[in-house]
Amino acid sequence: MSKAFKLTSKFKPSGDQPQAIEKLVAGLEDGLAYQTLLGVTGSGKTFTIANAIEKVQRPTLILEPNKTLAAQFYAEMREFFPENAVEYFVSYYDYYQPEAYVPSSDTYIEKDASINDHIEQMRLSATKAITERHDTIIIATVSAIYGLGDPDSYLKMLLHLTRGDQIDQRKILQRLAELQYTRNDLELRRATYRVNGDIIDIYPADSEREAVRVELFDDEVENLSYFDPLTGEMLRRVPRITVYPKTHYVTPREKLLSTLDQIKIELKERLSQLEKANKLVERQRLEQRTKFDMEMILELGYCSGIENYSRYLSGRNEGEPPPTLIDYLPKDALLIIDESHVTIPQLGGMYRGDRARKETLVEYGFRLPSALDNRPLRFDEFEKLAPQTIFISATPGPYEEKQSDQVVELLVRPTGLIDPEIEVRPVATQVDDLLSEIKKRAAQNERVLVTTLTKRMAEDLTEYFTEHNVRVRYLHSDIDTVERVEIIRDLRLGVFDVLVGINLLREGLDIPEVSLVAILDADKEGFLRSERSLIQTMGRAARNVHGKAILYADRITDSMKRAMEEAERRRIAQSAYNEKHHITPKSIQKAVTEIIEGARTYTERGRFVNQAQLIAEEEAKYIAMTPKQLAKELRKLEEQMYHHARNLEFEEAAAVRDKIQHIRKGLLEVKE
């Protein structure tokens, strides 16, 4: 039931966007393996990519460096492609403590995790969409390179039912048990089913709001329909349905049995090695733990930590890459790596940390050596598996520069804004000079960002400015994501005029009201004063028509020189375009509510409505909770919802459901 990708937007490509779209599409059609979209802040990189996807009509995986940016990109893509499958694939752990052993203190730390039920459903929905539909866009984090169930085993386990099928009810229930669904005749929850005479109701694990009703008559499927699991309202009849497993780690019975045989062989070899090395405690520990896991797999089809046996479950040889989300992609898929200067190093760094932890577990008899193959992809493996790729960055890293067959520039903004003017001023008078600049900007109702090199200096500067009647706040690393969003909102609203921080490169700081960025000690070479960091930081003033960047330095370093030359090159290109097309630059107008616009619920009519007013008083309470407290609170609300449903109080149940949806969606955009 795939449709064509159809972009919905009131805007048309403008500025550099039309030529960038054309070049990217031509590059993809010519078979270029790697391209880079070098786009300045505010140039419409997301819109450009959305247009390219529509033109090439290919399923797309978009990798983001963190959950916050993934949620922002997901929200934008859903608005651009309302008729297509836009999915979200990030880590489903609210809290995660990996299994580990500390030999120095003989401390074993058991794996402990709190799984976010809603994100688990979204992950299952993503793999279902990419399996069934060509018109799919998945927005993911680095979670995409971690081991997932083998796609072949996963797809073999699907339960297909068609109207008119001859099938025994017991056979359907047996298949549901194999998919790890549990029977619950009292209340229907995700990944459960209930039986009432010849009617089987199934709540699919990948579904957010729809359950399936299978009506049998004398071992024949008489009717198939979708219904609302809360109200019982019948939504539509269908000729066929497919039920997907509860988890990506389901495996056909015959493969489970062969897996157990292989585990037995490896266990025997490893026990012999440990005995020869006189590691008797480790030998006993490994034998006990592995035999318990084998018993669980034999009886239930899974065990806690079954992913540690993924080498056998997926039928791979020692050292071969594990199956990941990338294995689920079709052959003609497209890969887009956003903020590639951050995401690429992240992808390269995941393997080593995971390996070191697991080697200790293997050495001390907590796991079999095959557990080492339950791991994220190495970067060289990722490169081999990756389809045609587009990197997106305002400051591409050395890897992108080396790999790219084509660099497509997006320098001109649709608003006509040019990159901020840059000035270098001496360090000796930096504080007093900055104070006078701040007062000028505050008088014009504009905002200032100040970046320092140390926490101490940021604190002293904030104190000094406060003494001089400047309304200032300090953004430090101890501030959580939610408070950070509130600080940014207050800055935009004019509650204060100056924001001081150390690392202002993180997301969410593209604020149109900021007309001055001050970089103190700009001549101290290092991570936060590198060419890329300087370009990114100066770009924070690029959304205001009076944008300016002041670098306080006693000498011009190589990084400063390169950053200033690049900024000047961009300014010249932008000014020339404006002159040619008679464009007068305008500051970006952006409603303040947008920055925290996560309080939205997707209604049955398929459109977003803002629900912030409904539970505004309670939102702060939920946001302030720890992941464990939040999971407990959501479970309590779900119990309340099912209680109403059992008592046939459907309106109350639907209200609680909407409240749960609101909390989840609201937190999705502010979580990291």
Curated annotation (Swiss-Prot):
A motif (Beta-hairpin) lies at residues 92-115. Residues 631-666 form the UVR domain. Residues 430-592 form the Helicase C-terminal domain. GO terms for molecular function: ATP binding; ATP hydrolysis activity; DNA binding; excinuclease ABC activity; helicase activity. GO terms for biological process: nucleotide-excision repair; SOS response. SMART domains: DEXDc, HELICc. Keywords: ATP-binding, Cytoplasm, DNA damage, DNA excision, DNA repair, Excision nuclease, Helicase, Hydrolase, Nucleotide-binding, SOS response. It is found in: Cytoplasm. Pfam families: Helicase_C, ResIII, UVR, UvrB, UvrB_inter. ATP binds at residues 39-46. GO terms for cellular component: cytoplasm; excinuclease repair complex. Residues 26-181 form the Helicase ATP-binding domain. Forms a heterotetramer with UvrA during the search for lesions. Interacts with UvrC in an incision complex. The beta-hairpin motif is involved in DNA binding. The UvrABC repair system catalyzes the recognition and processing of DNA lesions. A damage recognition complex composed of 2 UvrA and 2 UvrB subunits scans DNA for abnormalities. Upon binding of the UvrA(2)B(2) complex to a putative damaged site, the DNA wraps around one UvrB monomer. DNA wrap is dependent on ATP binding by UvrB and probably causes local melting of the DNA helix, facilitating insertion of UvrB beta-hairpin between the DNA strands. Then UvrB probes one DNA strand for the presence of a lesion. Belongs to the UvrB family. This is UvrABC system protein B. It comes from Coxiella burnetii (strain RSA 331 / Henzerling II). The gene is uvrB.
